[in-house]
Amino acid sequence: RIPKVQQLLKDYFDGKEPNKGVNPDEAVAYGAAVQGGILSGEGGDETKDILLLDVAPLTLGIETVGGVMTKLIPRNTVIPSKKSQVFTTYQDQQTTVTIQVFEGERSLTKDCRLLGKFDLTGIAPAPRGTPQIEVTFEVDANGILNVKAEDKASGKSEKITITNDKGRLSQEEIERMVKEAEEFAEEDKKVKERIDARNSLETYVYNMRNQINDKDKLADKLESDEKEKIETATKEALEWLDDNQSAEKEDYEEKLKEVEAVCNPIITAVYQKSGGAPGGESGASEDDDHDEL
């Protein structure tokens, strides 16, 4: 109906003229009727071969350590859609995690929009990074979002339902958020990389501390001087982290290399001596490396 749009379509399709044989208002009404028939299951043979796609207008995700927007359902994902991801705890003996649900395209949740939150309690006390919390996002055909968090060890779970009529964004607001994400993409990337570098260092250090104090892992396999070296290196790294909250990505990466240079040779030698094989020199395989809540 809009001449400019017609021209853009023509240019996009290499000069091919758009089909103007259908009244625009009738096209909208027809599409709505077909979609209604498909969703209700009453379309019969006339709609069985017709596919109408609806998509998530903005990325959906949760907040993880450092205020990071961890994405579960990306923008423009065809709905209905379902996605699960396993997360873990950030602190030792942590028995509760807060699931904060956001929509938006930025790397940090402070620049996205909070949709809702809930707590999962009753997690068995364990060292940081041990519990496995499975978070599931499910968007139905009506755009209603169901979020569930389950502790895989105990089976305890909590959930929240977010409907698409409770203050959700207008099309103009959605377009503004997408535009802002594009505008700040490079800046957001640098901030995210810095947070990831800090989290990698922190996770490695705590993993080392847990391993050398766990009898099922390294506690009974290390010589006293070896254990002392690792304890000293990890203690100094944690003190450095406390004193350098705003360090750059390269600083965190350099500090991680320093700690690895002390710990990895000791860990490798212990496993070789015992005839075992370390699950990666950091002591954790990629499959066990989960974002922290």
Swiss-Prot record:
PROSITE patterns: ER_TARGET (PS00014). Residues 284-293 have a biased composition (Acidic residues). It is found in: Endoplasmic reticulum lumen. It comes from Nicotiana tabacum. A motif (Prevents secretion from ER) lies at residues 290-293. Its main location: endoplasmic reticulum. Probably plays a role in facilitating the assembly of multimeric protein complexes inside the ER. GO terms for cellular component: endoplasmic reticulum lumen. This is Luminal-binding protein 8. Residues 270-293 are annotated as: Disordered. InterPro entries: ATPase_NBD (IPR043129), HSP70_C_sf (IPR029048), HSP70_peptide-bd_sf (IPR029047), Hsp_70_fam (IPR013126). It holds the Pfam family HSP70. Belongs to the heat shock protein 70 family. GO terms for molecular function: ATP binding; ATP-dependent protein folding chaperone. Keywords: ATP-binding, Endoplasmic reticulum, Glycoprotein, Nucleotide-binding. Glycans are attached at N244.
